[in-house]
Design a protein with these regions (language model features):
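Short, surface-exposed loop and linker segments with low hydrophobicity and enrichment for Pro/Ser/Thr
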Residues: 1, 30-37
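Surface-exposed loop/edge segments in extracytoplasmic proteins
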Residues: 12-18, 49-54
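Short aromatic-glycine-(Arg/Gly/Cys) micro-motifs in beta-strand/loop hairpins
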Residues: 1-15
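Short linear proline/tyrosine/threonine-rich motifs used for host-factor recruitment
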Residues: 5, 18, 41-43
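Charged, amphipathic alpha-helical segments
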Residues: 20-31
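Short, mixed-charge low-complexity intrinsically disordered segments
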Residues: 34-68
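Generic structural motif
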Residues: 8-10, 22, 46, 58
Length: 68
């Protein structure tokens, strides 16, 4: 079995990594998905096509408000 991890960052960049072991894929994903700059991530079981882990993060960008 092989597993593919996809991470999408705030700036639109994305990275993928492939792992042969589920435990390794999940360990790396759990560590990476805690980064605040990750907006989306998933671990996909390549053989079955099943997404076994997923994270979505919505960001609100602060707007500067100037008072006179």
């Amino acid at each position: 079995m092989r597993f593919r991890m996809l991470l999408v960052y705030q700036d639109g960049q994305a990275t993928t990594s492939t792992f042969n072991l589920r435990n390794t894929a999940m360990m790396v994903f759990n560590s990476a998905s805690t980064q605040k700059r990750i907006t989306y991530g998933e671990v996909l079981d390549i053989d079955s096509g099943e997404v076994i882990a997923e994270v979505h993060r919505a960001y609100q960008f602060k707007q500067n408000t100037y008072h006179r």
